[in-house]
Design a protein with these regions (language model features):
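A cross-family phosphate/adenosyl-ligand binding-site feature
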Residues: 1-131
Length: 131
């Protein structure tokens, strides 16, 4: 970003971290994204005086603990659907978006309300997440 572009961009949406797709209350499908790239981008935008709306998947608090600014708002999410819904609500108010979260491509078609007991094989039907 050069200086002339910074004057145009005052509010930015950034997505970061993984999403977890629930199988049952104790199991999920996820990935190893740390969220560090999105956190670094948020920090740079804050350093340039931009307001940052950070939609953050389940990451270790250690990764973002030093990210502190009155220009920062963090929305914590868990699933791809939650990330989609948060972004759809926030994005219309933004000047730009940086989408670097590791969003799941698939989610279980159904989820169990109780822990699934271990008995033989388990088949999980996956359906695409919403883009």
């Amino acid at each position: 970003m050069n200086t002339s572009e910074n004057k145009k961009i005052q509010k930015v949406l950034i997505t970061a971290g993984p999403t977890y797709e629930r199988i049952d209350p104790v199991r999920f499908i996820g990935n190893y994204s740390s969220g560090k790239m999105g956190i670094a981008l948020a920090e740079e935008c804050l350093n340039r005086g931009m307001e940052v709306e950070l939609v953050l998947g389940p990451v270790n608090e250690f990764v973002y603990r030093n990210l502190n600014s009155p220009l920062l708002h963090i929305t914590h999410i868990e699933s791809a659907r939650q990330m989609y819904e948060a972004c759809m609500e926030i994005y219309p108010k933004m000047d730009a978006a940086i989408l670097c979260a590791a969003v799941a491509d698939f989610t279980p078609e159904t989820t169990a309300d109780q822990k699934i007991k271990r008995k033989g094989e388990m088949m999980i039907r996956l359906v695409p997440t919403q883009d």
